[in-house]
Amino acid sequence: MNVSLDVCSKSLNKREEELCGDTVEIVKTTDADIIILSDGMGSGVKANILSTLTTRILGTMLKNGETIEDCVETIAMTLPICKVRQVAYSTFTIIRITDNTTAEIIQFDNPNVILLRNGKSVDYPIVSRVIEGKTILESRIPLQLHDVFIAMSDGCPHAGIGLAYNFGWKREDIAEF
C-alpha cells in the first residue's frame, strides 16, 4: 500500500492586524514529517514574533532529535517577556507522523486536535504530564488510511463570539464542518 501525507494550513489575521499571531512550520526528517502550530500571546506583530520563535525553536530541536522536555525548557527560557503581562507565552501543537504509520501529538494550551476517521470525529488516548510547570498533552495514534487531523489555535473556537455564535464555535461543530 502506497501512503502519502497531505498537509495544508490556513491562517486569518485578526481584524485590523497586518500579521497573524499563528504560525505553522513543517519539518521533514528521514523518517518523519513534523507539523508545528503555534499561537503567540496577544495579536499582530507581538504574537507573530512569539509564535514564529516557538515554531522555529521546536522545529529545529525536534529535527535534531531533542526531547520534548528540552524543547519546552528552551522555549520557556528563550521567549521575550511581555512588559504588560510579565509572561513569555506561546501555545503549540506538534503532530509528528513517523514512517506514515504513527502520529504523535504533543499539545500545550491549544484546543485538542480533532481526529477524523472514516469521516467521523473519534476520541484518542491523551496522557497529561507537567514539564517546566506547563501541562503537556501527549498522544500516540496508529494511523489508518484517510485519517485526518485538524489542529487549531483558540481563534477557531472563539470565532463569532457574541456575533454569529453566542458561545463561540464548539469543537464538535468544527469537526462536523
Q: Whereabouts are the PLM-identified features?
A:
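Membrane-embedded alpha-helical signal segments
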Residues: 28-31, 35, 46
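Residue-level marker for buried hydrophobic side chains located in beta-strands
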Residues: 36, 107, 149-151
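Beta-strand-turn-beta hairpins that frame and shape the catalytic cleft
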Residues: 3-6, 29-32, 99-102, 144-147
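Catalytic core of PPM/PP2C metal-dependent serine/threonine phosphatase domains
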Residues: 20, 49-119, 136-137
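Acidic loop->beta-strand submotif enriched in PP2C/PPM serine/threonine phosphatases
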Residues: 17-30, 123-161
